[in-house]
Regions:
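Catalytic cores of enzymes
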Residues: 1-203
Length: 203
């Protein structure tokens, strides 16, 4: 997990800390190994190294979508932006799931809707089998809730399949996101702009 609640020169997003702490507790309870980079240690170099050695990645940070030069779209870390171009260049063997808990990570260009190259599509191109992303800005209140419920859904499979203990099974990632979004929808009622943006790409 990579969390950046206080990115230099950008607004604070304290909800990322709450989000990551909740997910870490879920993983600990299921004895799933993980690594968390937060704050000053969440640098571009550390981030890409982390991605090369782990099958799943969770970004909880600001992101910048560059519609003119999509490969320059980036995740904003402590010392700068981790660009999509740099991620795609890497050999991410075993890449499985990427959860992009940042704003507008699947926003393309409305003039080229069938040729969209956004952060989510780029992560698929980099080798990830599945990507959870957002179509527009998300609430710092609701984002952590959706993420926590998503991982709780994934980990609930371990209870049904004991042999999956100590492993984060991503086979039903799309279904887990569906349930977590439906839970938020029931809570918010007609506030569609808050629950619609969460999407799953890939397998």
């Amino acid at each position: 997990m990579i969390s950046q609640p206080e990115t230099p020169n950008l607004p604070c997003i304290p909800g990322t800390t709450k989000e990551v702490l909740a997910i870490m507790q879920l993983l600990k309870n299921n004895e799933v190994q993980f690594l968390c980079l937060e704050g000053e240690i969440a640098t571009v170099a550390q981030g890409i190294t982390y991605m090369e050695s782990h099958s799943c990645i969770h970004f909880a940070c600001h992101a910048h979508q560059n519609t003119q030069e999509p490969l320059k779209s980036e995740f904003m870390l402590h010392d700068g932006g981790l660009e999509l171009a740099d991620i795609i260049k890497r050999k991410l063997e075993g890449a499985d799931l990427a959860y992009l808990s940042a704003c507008q990570t699947s926003t393309g260009d409305e003039k080229l809707s069938e040729e969209a190259v956004h952060l989510a599509a780029g992560m698929l191109a980099a080798g990830y089998c599945g990507v959870v992303a957002t179509m527009w800005s998300i609430s710092d209140r609701h984002g952590p809730q959706v993420a926590e419920d998503f991982y709780a859904g994934l980990l609930s499979q371990n209870l049904e399949e004991p042999e999956q203990m100590h492993v984060l099974s991503t086979d039903n990632a799309a279904l887990a996101l569906h349930y977590s979004v439906q839970k938020l929808r029931k809570q918010l009622g007609d506030s569609a702009l808050d629950w619609i943006p969460y999407v799953h790409f890939g397998l």
